[in-house]
Amino acid sequence: MIVGLGNDLVDIRRIERMLVRYGERFIQRIFTDIERNRSENLKKNSSSYAKRFAAKEACAKALGTGIACGINWKDMGVVNLSSGKPIMQLTNHAQVQLQKLLPPHHDAIIHLSITDDFPWAQAFVIIEALPRG
Protein backbone atom coordinates (compact mmCIF):
# COMPACT_ATOMS: atom_id res chain seq x y z
CA MET A 1 0.00 0.00 0.00
CA ILE A 2 1.17 3.56 -0.68
CA VAL A 3 1.82 5.47 2.54
CA GLY A 4 3.58 8.52 1.12
CA LEU A 5 3.82 10.48 -2.12
CA GLY A 6 5.88 13.57 -2.88
CA ASN A 7 7.11 15.49 -5.88
CA ASP A 8 9.23 18.58 -6.43
CA LEU A 9 10.28 20.80 -9.32
CA VAL A 10 13.50 22.83 -9.05
CA ASP A 11 14.87 25.53 -11.34
CA ILE A 12 18.46 24.42 -12.07
CA ARG A 13 19.47 28.08 -12.46
CA ARG A 14 18.45 28.65 -8.83
CA ILE A 15 20.79 25.88 -7.70
CA GLU A 16 23.54 27.34 -9.94
CA ARG A 17 23.10 30.70 -8.18
CA MET A 18 23.30 28.99 -4.78
CA LEU A 19 26.48 27.20 -5.82
CA VAL A 20 28.06 30.47 -7.00
CA ARG A 21 26.91 32.51 -4.01
CA TYR A 22 27.50 30.03 -1.18
CA GLY A 23 29.76 27.41 -2.78
CA GLU A 24 31.06 24.74 -0.46
CA ARG A 25 28.96 26.00 2.46
CA PHE A 26 25.75 25.23 0.52
CA ILE A 27 27.06 21.87 -0.67
CA GLN A 28 28.19 20.81 2.82
CA ARG A 29 24.87 21.81 4.41
CA ILE A 30 22.58 20.02 1.94
CA PHE A 31 24.36 17.04 0.40
CA THR A 32 25.88 13.81 1.73
CA ASP A 33 29.46 12.81 0.91
CA ILE A 34 28.17 10.26 -1.61
CA GLU A 35 26.02 12.89 -3.34
CA ARG A 36 28.90 15.37 -3.45
CA ASN A 37 31.31 12.81 -4.91
CA ARG A 38 28.78 11.76 -7.56
CA SER A 39 27.91 15.34 -8.54
CA GLU A 40 31.48 16.66 -8.61
CA ASN A 41 32.49 13.92 -11.06
CA LEU A 42 29.94 15.15 -13.63
CA LYS A 43 30.39 17.97 -16.16
CA LYS A 44 26.95 19.41 -15.41
CA ASN A 45 27.15 19.21 -11.64
CA SER A 46 24.50 21.91 -11.12
CA SER A 47 21.95 19.61 -12.81
CA SER A 48 23.06 16.72 -10.61
CA TYR A 49 22.80 18.82 -7.46
CA ALA A 50 19.40 20.16 -8.57
CA LYS A 51 18.03 16.63 -9.12
CA ARG A 52 19.26 15.55 -5.70
CA PHE A 53 17.81 18.69 -4.09
CA ALA A 54 14.44 17.96 -5.73
CA ALA A 55 14.63 14.34 -4.56
CA LYS A 56 15.17 15.43 -0.95
CA GLU A 57 12.24 17.87 -1.13
CA ALA A 58 10.00 15.19 -2.69
CA CYS A 59 11.05 12.66 -0.05
CA ALA A 60 10.36 15.09 2.79
CA LYS A 61 6.89 15.67 1.34
CA ALA A 62 6.31 11.91 1.04
CA LEU A 63 7.30 11.56 4.70
CA GLY A 64 4.59 14.08 5.50
CA THR A 65 6.86 16.61 7.18
CA GLY A 66 8.59 18.70 4.57
CA ILE A 67 11.97 19.86 5.81
CA ALA A 68 10.85 20.16 9.42
CA CYS A 69 10.25 18.12 12.55
CA GLY A 70 13.98 17.56 13.06
CA ILE A 71 14.59 16.12 9.60
CA ASN A 72 17.90 17.37 8.25
CA TRP A 73 18.83 17.64 4.57
CA LYS A 74 21.57 15.06 5.09
CA ASP A 75 19.11 12.59 6.66
CA MET A 76 18.01 11.88 3.07
CA GLY A 77 20.53 10.90 0.41
CA VAL A 78 20.37 9.85 -3.22
CA VAL A 79 22.64 6.90 -3.98
CA ASN A 80 23.09 5.37 -7.41
CA LEU A 81 23.20 1.59 -7.78
CA SER A 82 25.84 0.09 -10.08
CA SER A 83 23.15 0.06 -12.79
CA GLY A 84 22.81 3.85 -12.39
CA LYS A 85 19.35 3.62 -10.83
CA PRO A 86 18.92 6.24 -8.10
CA ILE A 87 17.62 5.15 -4.72
CA MET A 88 16.85 7.16 -1.58
CA GLN A 89 18.60 6.24 1.66
CA LEU A 90 17.23 7.59 4.94
CA THR A 91 19.04 7.99 8.25
CA ASN A 92 18.43 9.60 11.63
CA HIS A 93 15.13 11.51 11.96
CA ALA A 94 14.03 10.75 8.39
CA GLN A 95 14.30 7.02 9.14
CA VAL A 96 12.32 7.52 12.37
CA GLN A 97 9.58 9.38 10.49
CA LEU A 98 9.48 6.63 7.85
CA GLN A 99 8.89 4.01 10.54
CA LYS A 100 5.97 6.06 11.91
CA LEU A 101 4.25 5.81 8.51
CA LEU A 102 4.38 2.02 8.42
CA PRO A 103 1.64 -0.26 9.71
CA PRO A 104 2.81 -3.02 12.08
CA HIS A 105 4.73 -5.87 10.42
CA HIS A 106 5.41 -3.89 7.22
CA ASP A 107 8.65 -2.84 5.53
CA ALA A 108 9.13 0.28 3.43
CA ILE A 109 10.15 0.50 -0.18
CA ILE A 110 11.03 3.98 -1.41
CA HIS A 111 10.57 4.47 -5.15
CA LEU A 112 12.48 7.42 -6.63
CA SER A 113 12.38 8.93 -10.10
CA ILE A 114 14.51 11.95 -11.00
CA THR A 115 14.90 13.78 -14.29
CA ASP A 116 16.09 17.07 -15.70
CA ASP A 117 15.49 19.11 -18.83
CA PHE A 118 17.15 22.50 -18.49
CA PRO A 119 16.15 24.64 -16.73
CA TRP A 120 14.10 22.14 -14.70
CA ALA A 121 14.95 19.23 -12.42
CA GLN A 122 12.13 17.08 -11.09
CA ALA A 123 11.74 14.24 -8.62
CA PHE A 124 8.94 11.91 -7.55
CA VAL A 125 9.00 9.75 -4.43
CA ILE A 126 6.51 7.02 -3.56
CA ILE A 127 6.77 5.27 -0.21
CA GLU A 128 5.23 1.81 -0.26
CA ALA A 129 4.51 -0.39 2.75
CA LEU A 130 4.82 -4.13 2.08
CA PRO A 131 3.86 -6.87 4.55
CA ARG A 132 6.84 -8.80 5.89
CA GLY A 133 7.23 -12.39 4.87
From Swiss-Prot:
Mg(2+) binds at residues 8, 57. Keywords: Cytoplasm, Fatty acid biosynthesis, Fatty acid metabolism, Lipid biosynthesis, Lipid metabolism, Magnesium, Metal-binding, Transferase. Pfam families: ACPS. It catalyses: apo-[ACP] + CoA = holo-[ACP] + adenosine 3',5'-bisphosphate + H(+). GO terms for molecular function: holo-[acyl-carrier-protein] synthase activity; magnesium ion binding. Its cofactor is Mg(2+). It comes from the Bacteria. Its main location: cytoplasm. InterPro entries: 4-PPantetheinyl_Trfase_dom, 4-PPantetheinyl_Trfase_dom_sf, ACPS, Ppantetheine-prot_Trfase_dom. The keyword Transferase applies. Its EC number is 2.7.8.7. GO terms for cellular component: cytoplasm. GO terms for biological process: fatty acid biosynthetic process. It is found in: Cytoplasm. It is an enzyme of class 2 (transferase). Transfers the 4'-phosphopantetheine moiety from coenzyme A to a Ser of acyl-carrier-protein. Belongs to the P-Pant transferase superfamily. AcpS family. This is Holo-[acyl-carrier-protein] synthase. The gene is acpS.
